[in-house]
Amino acid sequence: MKKKTKIILSTLLILVGLGLLGTAGWLWYDANVDRSGWELLEDGSYSYRDFHGKSVTGWLSLEDRTCYFDDDYRMVTGWQTIDAKRYHFGSDGVLSLGWVELEGSRYYFGEDGVLRTGWQDLPEGRYYFGTDGAMTTYWRDIEGRSYYFLPEGPMATGWQDLPKGRYYFDEDGHYLTGAQEMEDGERYFLEDGTMVTGWLDLEDGKYYYDLEGFKCVGWQEIEGKYYFFDEDGLMQTGWHEEGEYSYYLQEDGSAATGRQELEGQVYYFTPKGIMVVLVNKDNPIPSYYKTDVVVAEDYHLIQRVAQEPLQKMLVDCRAAVGSCGFNSSYRTQKEQTEILETRTQEYMDTGMTHQEAYEETLKTVALPGTSEHQLGLSADLTGKEANEWLAEHCWEYGFILRYPEGKKDITGIINEPWHFRYVGTRVSLDMKDTGLCLEEYLGAV
């Protein structure tokens, strides 16, 4: 009986002791009950208790977020440096990942949340981030080289049209400079990378690049003037020969036009720069002109360069209208003098004085040394139908109607529908439909 009473008293003492401990601040929990959750602190920040109800410090990964808690159990927000690495947390404490725009700048955070700096190869392209992590846009000098980054951030490659001009960036983002042989042609880039268009002065001479940046070769019309560039693109000056055509390229490279005095001699050039020998009462045959005549038909002679075109024109004309007479072509100084004297005498035989006869003769016969026939480039072809056909088609063979109707005051010769002068198709086709005689076309009036 006494032993049983002692056991009961001992049990009561234990229960009273436990009760006293509980009232002293001790709590007892079931270890299998989840006590995790958020707690709003007095300063407005949050802390988090884990499964056992213990406040968390350091990293915490939940199903929908990753957060970080400082040593005071507070969840951090904004920029944070943790273990010498930079991170960013939103106002809700969530770790920033991937692209984030903050205060007007873009940043990139890796899958681990670490802020990326320097060069970064991303799916959208290659980017560069400053030491503060801000994404670079537009021009940036990096380790002594200049790069351009698109407004969206990727490093520029290939062609880029920028405010200062056009650039080409290689796969490393370096812009090209100097002469570059590209797939579609040669271009030139200045030291600052801008593609050249227009004129370029180099040590060996002048070059010209079109609006697409291609180096020009051959003939080019630039601001109404004609220039010639060799196969390397170098602008040419001085005399330039192309088959039967001669050009004079002035000091600035432009082809001479109109009347020009060169080394004491008078030359005439078309609006496109082709030299044409002009012979009339004011322009005798120049000393530099050389004859090289061959047989055109029967006993008629013609300058070698005009032989084949004249023969073809005659064949085609006769095939079209049936006949075409060949009256006259090349004449020597002696022959021209004899014609002038004979014609003058014929007029005198009608009762004219010598002066009257001479003046009448000059309406159709040129003074020796000023006759087109002495060039060996003209032919008098007869027949009404033939002349009509030739007036329409002579241009196709390189000939012009030398003395058209209504131009006597300029040419000094009345209309001669039979007189055709060879100038080459480059000139004849350009003159066609202009309504100009040769003097007008060459700027000699």
State where each predicted segment sits.
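Extracytoplasmic cell-surface/polysaccharide-interacting catalytic and binding patches
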Residues: 10, 32, 263-265, 270-445
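Extracellular adhesion/carbohydrate-binding repeat motifs centered on closely spaced tryptophans
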Residues: 2-275, 308, 392
